[in-house]
Swiss-Prot record:
KW Translocase (keyword) present: yes
Source organism of this protein record: Limosilactobacillus reuteri (strain DSM 20016) (Lactobacillus reuteri)
Intrachain S-S bonds: none
Record keywords, A-Z: ATP synthesis, ATP-binding, Cell membrane, CF(1), Hydrogen ion transport, Ion transport, Membrane, Nucleotide-binding, Translocase, Transport
Subcellular location: Cell membrane
GO MF annotations, alphabetized: ATP binding; ATP hydrolysis activity; proton-transporting ATP synthase activity, rotational mechanism
Protein name: ATP synthase subunit beta
Catalytic activity: ATP + H2O + 4 H(+)(in) = ADP + phosphate + 5 H(+)(out)
Gene name linked to the record: atpD
The keyword Transferase appears for this protein: no
The organism's place on the tree of life at top rank: Bacteria
GO CC terms of this entry: plasma membrane; proton-transporting ATP synthase complex
Length: 475
């Protein structure tokens, strides 16, 4: 392969000059620079400047680089390890292990991170629901197999626990694999996530890729592609259903904006890169269902200053099939998962896709909860006595529904002391249908909280009654 020399270094941007009689590296090719301390720095070609000079973006710090250092053209884009050996491991953007585990040798299976989206002929055009076993999601904001879901929520509302439960349920219910990609978030959070997943027993079915906020923009921009490439192997070669978590998709855009400015491109709206829609599309179009398997992506979305018209979240929304909104108000009254049943949405919630019964039950649940929401002001000011009998019934059922939307999680059982429950979709629909019909109006509201299927509610109510009878007989 051809070799050149470092011409200039401007932060994470490295210009490299190649002899005019040698073949220039192509855009997205990886270059290797041997540093004086023996380490190798990888850069990626971003621009050709002419006269044998290319402008590259470094995937690590450029401290210690000097003009004239030798640069080797690898003749290919960055490639990362794939396959079963990646499970339970933590990687950086280059696919190098960062968990103090064994390194991957030259014989390890690898795939380039820059790949085309699947061809139209290879896509699975049937819309299938991906059952998660989590009642509130399956009923009100169902996930599509091969779809993209936006996860919204502030700090401490249970995003991580929900992500872990999804990983657990996909592994148990679908024998699926998960890939967690940390893009531009805090190193401490990545570290905590690793140990929490280890403790909850889901790590061996998960590959983790991190490009944290202290890393150069090149690494943060490409780390999502590294995680996606690992997921694509399990979909295309192993024929599996894969969950791909990206936390946070906004940081992917932010890193692209930094790189764009470093390359001297004229910024677009609000200072973002002019190639924003293209970069987002190249990533999102690779996340899909094929005839072999599927990649379903759950992406945490940070909304700058809560402005949903900002180009970064607005470009992301164009690709989403569903949104799962976590609400702090629900955590304060002990409803976990704290998914807002009225704010969460899904394009799949139509009778043609989920079926007539599911659609009708879901819309009735939303109607009852919306009516309860409207009546809360009256209740807080005037009290329950001012409501009509019909309104009192709606409030009573809405409270039971709200409690029944909560659920005990397997990954949280060590903290709650309650066994986790995977609830099949049929059971979920049956339970809510019977609550709406008034079948359980006589059971206490508390019996509906943090349980699995409706049978658990009946069982819990019996226990509560037995305990009450026991206490009264002792008195």
């Amino acid at each position: 392969m051809s070799s050149g020399k470092v011409l200039q270094v401007i932060g994470p941007v490295v210009d490299v000059e190649f002899p005019l009689d040698e073949k220039l590296p192509e855009i997205n090719d990886a270059l290797k620079i041997k540093e004086s301390d023996g380490k190798t720095l990888t850069t990626e070609v971003a621009l050709e400047l002419g006269d044998g000079v290319v402008r590259t973006i470094a995937m690590d710090g450029t401290d210690g680089l000097q003009r004239g250092m030798e640069v080797e053209n690898t003749g290919a884009s960055i490639s990362v390890p794939v396959g079963d050996d990646t499970l339970g491991r933590v990687f950086n953007v280059l696919g190098e292990p960062v968990d103090n585990g064994p390194k991957f040798g030259p014989d390890a299976k690898r795939m380039p991170i820059h790949r085309d989206a699947p061809k139209y002929d290879d896509l699975n055009n049937a819309t299938e629901i991906l059952e998660t076993g989590i009642k509130v999601i399956d009923l009100l904001a169902p996930y599509v197999r091969g779809g993209k879901i936006g996860l919204f929520g502030g700090a401490g509302v249970g995003k991580t626990v929900l992500i872990q439960e999804l990983i657990h349920n996909i592994a148990q219910g679908h024998n699926g694999i998960s890939v967690f990609t940390g893009v531009g978030e805090r190193t401490r959070e990545g570290n905590d996530m690793y140990y929490e997943m280890k403790a909850s027993g889901v790590l061996e079915k998960t590959a983790m890729v991190y490009g944290q906020m202290n890393e150069p923009p090149g690494a943060r921009m490409r780390v999502a592609l590294t995680g996606l490439t690992i997921a694509e192997y399990f979909r295309d070669v192993k024929g599996q259903d894969v969950l791909l978590f990206i936390d946070n998709i906004f940081r992917f855009t932010q890193a692209g904006s930094e790189v764009s400015a470093l390359l001297g491109r004229i910024p677009s709206a609000v200072g973002y890169q002019p190639t924003l829609a293209t970069e987002m599309g190249q990533l999102q179009e690779r996340i899909t269902s094929t005839k072999k398997g599927s990649i379903t992506s759950i992406q945490a979305v940070y909304v700058p200053a809560d402005d949903y018209t900002d180009p970064a979240p607005a470009t992301t929304f164009a690709h989403l099939d569903a949104t799962t909104n976590l609400e702090r108000r629900l955590t304060q009254i002990g409803i976990y998962p704290a998914v807002d049943p009225l704010a969460s949405t899904s394009t799949a919630l139509t009778p043609e896709i989920v079926g007539k019964e599911h659609y009708e039950v879901a819309t009735q649940v939303q109607h009852v909860l919306q009516r309860y929401h409207e009546l809360q002001d009256i209740i807080s000011i005037l009290g329950m006595d001012e409501l009509s009998d019909e309104e009192k019934t709606i409030v009573a059922r809405a409270r039971r529904i709200q409690n029944f939307l909560s659920q005990s999680f397997s990954v949280a059982s060590q903290f709650t002391g309650l066994p986790g429950k995977y609830v099949p979709l049929k059971e979920t629909i049956k339970g809510f249908k019977e609550i709406l019909a008034g079948k359980y109006d006589d059971l206490p509201e508390e019996a509906f909280r943090l349980v699995g299927p409706i049978e658990d509610v009946v069982e819990k109510a019996k226990k509560m009654k037995a305990e009450t009878d026991e206490d009264s007989s002792e008195d």
